[in-house]
Design a protein with these regions (language model features):
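N-terminal intrinsically disordered, acidic low-complexity segments at the extreme N-terminus
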Residues: 1-20
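Short, low-complexity patches enriched in S/T/P/G
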Residues: 20-31
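Hydrophobic membrane-insertion alpha-helices, especially the h-region
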Residues: 29-50
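Structural detector for internal amphipathic alpha-helices that build alpha-solenoid repeat scaffolds
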Residues: 44-53, 72-90, 113-128, 137, ...
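Amphipathic alpha-helical scaffolding segments comprising HEAT/armadillo-like alpha-solenoid repeats
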Residues: 51-65, 87-108, 128-140, 159-171, ...
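Short inter-helical turns and helix N-cap capping residues of alpha-solenoid HEAT/ARM repeat scaffolds
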Residues: 69-70, 109-112, 142-143, 173-174, ...
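Short, mixed-charge aromatic SLiMs
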Residues: 104-107, 147, 282-283
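C-terminal/domain-terminus segments
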Residues: 273-289
Length: 294
């Protein structure tokens, strides 16, 4: 028996209608999907790169500083070393790394000043008192930024043997160096600096006076208490130019802490008011802690 195939009528060309894809689908097909594929490939590449990446050791970075190219490598290696050293201190505590670092620092007077700056910070982060003589010597550099990095490193180590050298920089022609010197003395807390800090209370630079007052409070000296009282006055802080709200807040917090440390009676009522009504919660917390000293 013959099977009949049902006939299907085919429309004429004029009756055919083109089915158009949405524009968004075309964009996805030609642009978005390829971008997704590329992003996945890049992600896989970065993942494998991260898995196979091995960070250099402090000694390797130091070797790069010692032997690297002046144009591109030495200061970058010194920078990386300053960033990783804090997490590596335990591993190198009983090695000669500190002595090697000091030698490289002492031999870095010529060339890119950034090398010396970052090596100074590295010695500070390391916190080893053996680096103090080299850092004191570095205070004589003509580069003011390196002077400040050396001061900061000495403050981090906080060895009182550095006090006389730091005091000398309270009279620097550069106000930034004077400010850093006063700040560092607040960290070292050496009563031997009291007389020079009292003189610094009359400095022409506001910040030098502030940090001198803070440093004096750290050694129990109330000579700068009136300077600190101004820093817990919102009207005074609001008039300061060139400071962010966060910086002004930190100034007030430091002043509150120092006045509490001194148990300075004229400040008690004002600190009490700050603890109850100040809009800055950090100032309130600092005030509550300071009141515990009275």
């Amino acid at each position: 028996m013959e099977t009949k195939t049902p006939s299907v009528s085919i429309p004429s060309a004029d009756d055919l209608v083109e089915i158009k894809r949405p524009t968004s689908l075309l964009i996805a097909q030609f642009f978005l999907f390829p971008l997704i594929i590329i992003a996945i490939c890049v992600g896989i590449f970065l993942l494998f790169g991260y898995l196979t990446y091995e960070q250099k050791s402090p000694q390797e970075y130091l070797n790069d500083v010692r032997t690297g190219s002046e144009l591109c490598c030495r200061w970058q290696s010194a920078y990386e070393l300053s960033n990783i050293i804090s997490s590596q201190k335990a591993k190198i505590r009983n090695t000669d790394f500190v002595n090697d670092l000091i030698k490289v620092y002492q031999n870095s007077r010529e060339g890119d000043p950034r090398v010396r700056r970052y090596l100074a910070l590295t010695m500070g982060h390391l916190g080893d008192p053996r680096a103090v003589p080299a850092l004191i010597e570095g205070l004589n550099d003509n580069d003011s930024e390196n002077q400040m990095n050396n001061l900061l490193a000495l403050g981090t180590i906080a060895d009182k043997s550095a006090t006389p050298a730091i005091i000398q920089h309270l009279t620097s022609n550069n106000p930034a160096v004077r400010k850093m010197s006063a700040f560092v003395l607040s960290a070292i807390k050496d009563p031997a600096a009291a007389r020079d800090l009292e003189i610094a209370l009359n400095d022409t630079n506001d910040e030098v006076r502030w940090y001198a007052a803070i440093a004096l409070a750290q050694i129990g000296n109330a000579s700068g208490a009136n300077v600190l009282m101004r820093l817990i006055d919102h009207n005074y802080l609001e008039q300061l130019q060139g400071f962010t709200l966060e910086q002004k807040s930190q100034l007030m917090i430091n002043a509150v802490k120092c006045l509490g440390l001194l148990k300075f009676e004229p400040a008690k009522d004002r600190i009490l008011a700050l603890s109850q009504t100040d809009s800055d919660l950090a100032v309130r917390d600092a005030s509550l802690e300071a009141l515990k000293n009275y």
